């Protein structure tokens, strides 16, 4: 999970994520197929604020349509931003509250990439 501020438009950011995936050997042949790297744009802006982007294009759906149902997305998100909120339908919900409703079996933290100096 990466939280970032950017001046890139959502489409430009998505193209950049796809380019990074390709640099790491990802080939987009089969939807939901095996992949070497999977970078998703989950949300753009904070729900309920002027910076929020809701996009309903077949190639870019924001917020990510399945993020609210995936503990493997919400768990690391909550770890890096305990105050995070996400849009679920018309509601804006704390990630922590949504996470409590999901089965977290098999979800475990990855390596800690923070600098140790």
Q: What does each model-identified segment do?
A:
Residues 1-5:
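Short, charge-patterned binding micro-sites
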Residues 8-117:
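Flexible, gly/pro- and Lys/Arg-enriched active-site loops
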């Amino acid at each position: 999970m990466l939280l970032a501020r950017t001046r890139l438009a959502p489409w430009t950011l998505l193209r950049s994520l796809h380019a990074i995936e390709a640099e790491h050997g990802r080939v987009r042949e089969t939807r939901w197929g095996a992949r070497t790297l999977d970078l998703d744009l989950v949300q753009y802006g904070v729900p309920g604020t002027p910076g929020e982007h809701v996009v309903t294009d077949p190639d870019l759906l924001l917020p990510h349509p399945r993020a609210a149902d995936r503990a493997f997305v919400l768990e690391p998100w909550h770890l890096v931003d305990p105050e995070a909120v996400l849009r679920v339908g018309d509601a804006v919900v704390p990630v922590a509250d949504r996470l409590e409703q999901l089965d977290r079996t098999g979800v475990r933290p990855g390596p800690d990439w923070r600098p140790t100096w």
